[in-house]
A protein has these predicted regions:
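C-terminal structural segments of small proteins and small subunits
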Residues: 87-112
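Short hydrophobic/aromatic beta-strand or adjacent loop that forms the aromatic wall/cage
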Residues: 74-76, 109-110
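Short S/T/G/P-rich N-terminal loop/turn motif that feeds into the first structured element of a domain
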Residues: 6-75, 81-92, 115-117
């Protein structure tokens, strides 16, 4: 993307600069097991607002429509962020850490944050 800067001192001077846009980041959570549905519900009540307050956009969540390879029917959550740094900051935020404390051992899961190509 190009941005145009207009120089007000020299009415005819334009400066073109290339705007660099950071690649988006995707947070992928997979749940291997839910050990305590009450703890998971408490986590979900806190985690959603904590993440959206930090720029998260929930793209998909739930059981897979179709599985291949190992065929594991794991609950999966896909969240988009504007950057890896934003996703990491959301994870490390006090509000999300409170959600993790509420979850405790209520689920066996994995979170991955990846940068878009």
């Amino acid at each position: 993307r190009l941005a145009v800067d207009y120089d007000t001192r020299h009415c005819q001077t334009y400066t073109y600069r290339r705007e660099t846009q950071m690649p988006k980041a995707y947070w992928i959570s997979t749940y291997r097991a839910v050990n305590d549905s009450d703890k998971l519900a408490a986590y979900a009540k806190l985690a959603g607002p904590a993440l959206t307050a930090n720029g998260a956009r929930f793209l998909a969540r739930g059981e897979p429509s179709k599985v291949y390879e190992l065929g594991l029917m794991q609950r999966t959550v896909l969240i988009e962020f504007d950057s890896v740094e934003q996703a990491v900051a959301a994870h490390d935020s006090p509000a999300y850490q409170a959600a993790l404390a509420a979850l405790g051992d209520g689920a066996d899961r994995e979170i991955r944050i990846i940068e878009a190509a």
